[in-house]
Amino acid sequence: CTPYPCDYDYAKRSMHMTHRWLKRCCDRFDSTEGKYGFEQTFFPIVQGSVYKDLRLQSAEKIASFEREGNAIGGLSVGEPHHMMYEMTETVCSVLPWDKPRYLMGVGTPVNLLENIALGIDMFDCVMPTRNARNGMIFTSEGTINLKNKKWENDYSPLDPNGTSFVDSTYTKAYVRHLFRSNELLGKQIATLHNIRFYLWLMEEAQKQLEEGTFTKWKNMMVKKLDLRL
């Protein structure tokens, strides 16, 4: 995984190293028996930094291994969001549509929806828990920093549309008080909220995809999710 920014030659060398590792990994993986009655899946990782030709080359190489699914790495490392989306779209144009596409280390709620629209199926990210520990929660109306003074006397629910029990149990003012007092309960409440919000967002995205209304819903949601309240 290359940092951002990195020069073309470094990105190219790193990509080829990834491809060499991949062959050895596949050989080892396929020669290893599963344990305890469970089998694992192997997702090779597309690299290439923010260089379109390298991403295309890597995606073609990765797809040629015909594994159970495919991953996209080396994004969300500091590059502008428009570059992330451009690279995602480039790679998804090559990776087979009938196998899961996993975008690693992404991202904000807006990032998730925009990348789903480009063909991504799976994500992982520390953002909902890490940001929660620092007082930031994601809601259906936008992002809130609970440490800000504006929430000191706000006794409304964390998220009036939230689906977690903490949303209807605790107020913004109370959770802000917990953070200001360095009470661990504040971090726990914010973490529970953010994890449930991310789960709800993905559940709703799946529903909208199945109903054929994803694009309209996504465009509406992105405008709200991008707000800092």
Regions from the PLM with identified roles:
Residues 32, 37-158:
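Glycine-rich phosphate/ribose-binding loops and adjacent secondary-structure elements
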Residues 28-38, 99, 205-217:
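Surface-exposed helix-capping loop/turn segments at secondary-structure junctions
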Residues 14, 18-21, 25, 58, ...:
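Alpha-helical packing segments of well-folded alpha/beta enzyme cores
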Residues 13, 20, 82, 86, ...:
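Conserved active-site and cofactor/substrate-binding residues in soluble primary-metabolism enzymes
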Residues 1-23, 28-32, 39-42, 46-53:
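Active-site beta->alpha loop and helix N-cap motifs at the rims of alpha/beta catalytic domains
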Residues 1-7, 159-229:
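C-terminal extensions of enzymes
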